[in-house]
Regions:
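Acidic-enriched, low-complexity/disordered segments with a strong bias for Aspartate over Glutamate
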Residues: 6-8, 25, 37, 42, ...
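N-terminal start-of-chain detector that recognizes signal peptides
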Residues: 10-12, 34-41, 89-94
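General structural signal for secondary-structure boundaries
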Residues: 1-4, 46, 72-74, 113
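Extracytoplasmic cell-surface/polysaccharide-interacting catalytic and binding patches
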Residues: 1-25
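Catalytic cores and adjacent binding grooves of peptidoglycan-active enzymes
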Residues: 13, 56-64, 70-119
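Extended, low-complexity, intrinsically disordered C-terminal regulatory tails
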Residues: 17-57
Length: 119
């Protein structure tokens, strides 16, 4: 597992245990199917950090979200789409889906905030 910042490596085990399990599955899938290693760029945040990043959701503060880098050369749009489809379509994870502001039930999506990433 790769982390952009040491802070996030230290905070990783403080995330919700189900999120850790789901990420481990996604990371395994990315390695075994696409031969890429994912990089976690953000884990737990404070309210001040969220305000600075213009976040509208409390999911990072509540240990329910991570950001995964997608801008490296080996993560082309097909791979990004496949990773999101894989994690969102697993029947055993359906009960953990959340309802997005747009009314979609999902676990992961591609987002361009301060940089392109899977959230």
């Amino acid at each position: 597992m790769k982390f952009k910042q040491d802070k996030d490596m230290l905070l990783f085990t403080s995330l919700h245990p189900i999120l850790i399990m789901i990420y481990a599955d996604l990371n395994w899938y990315a390695k075994s199917r696409h031969f890429v290693e994912l990089t976690i760029t953000d884990t737990i945040s404070t309210l001040a950090e969220d305000k600075k990043l213009n976040r509208t959701s409390s999911s990072h503060r509540e240990c329910r979200a991570i950001d995964i880098r997608t801008e490296q050369a080996d993560l082309d749009p097909y791979i990004i789409s496949d990773l999101i489809k894989y994690i969102n379509s697993k029947p055993e994870y359906k009960r953990f889906h959340y309802l997005s502001n747009g009314g979609q039930k999902r676990l992961a999506y591609f987002h361009v905030g301060n940089a392109p990433h899977i959230h």
